[in-house]
């Protein structure tokens, strides 16, 4: 058993038989009273997010999670097929486990899969990916002076908000955690 001093972003803890990933944590030492740790946890199976507070020094059960490099191969119905880059074994991961990561995955892209006792928990992507805009309305001449945005569909089928001056065929960098446009990529 570990203590609250060992809490870090990304670790997985076991609470009442369910696995929770730490999204955020903050050690708080108020002027009056004892210190405590405020956490934001995400259930790795259901995706539910909760806030939980622990007294400083409380015991927690940190679960060992094996993170392995995989390559995304293709989508098979609602499932996604990945190949282990070390031994070339293929695994099929159901869509609900892949979750929102599917919006940003391209074929042959390297990802990290978190495994617990051989079962996939979730798919981790890089912080940002480069995607090509496959469709967006043309920007009007007078719209360039304003700081507005317009919807654009990227090659995975996901829709993002982009500045008005971008056109179909432009490559853009997208934040995989929020889905926000980060910038244009020049080839």
From Swiss-Prot:
SUPFAM superfamilies in the cross-refs: Nucleic acid-binding proteins, Translation proteins SH3-like domain
One annotated GO molecular function: translation elongation factor activity
Matches recorded under Pfam families: EFP, EFP_N, Elong-fact-P_C
InterPro entries noted in UniProt: Elong-fact-P_C, NA-bd_OB-fold, Rib_uL2_dom2, Transl_elong_fac_P/YeiP, Transl_elong_KOW-like, Transl_elong_P/YeiP_cen, Transl_elong_P/YeiP_CS, Transl_elongation_fac_P
GO BP field: peptide biosynthetic process
UniProtKB keywords: Cytoplasm, Elongation factor, Protein biosynthesis
Compartment(s) where it occurs, according to its Swiss-Prot or TrEMBL record: Cytoplasm
GO CC list: cytoplasm
Keyword Protein biosynthesis: yes
Pathway entry: Protein biosynthesis; polypeptide chain elongation
Domain of life from the UniProt record: Bacteria
Family the entry assigns: Belongs to the elongation factor P family.
Its biological purpose: Involved in peptide bond synthesis. Stimulates efficient translation and peptide-bond synthesis on native or reconstituted 70S ribosomes in vitro. Probably functions indirectly by altering the affinity of the ribosome for aminoacyl-tRNA, thus increasing their reactivity as acceptors for peptidyl transferase.
Protein name stated in the entry: Elongation factor P
Native organism taxonomy: Bacteria, Bacillati, Actinomycetota, Actinomycetes, Micrococcales
Gene that produces this protein: efp
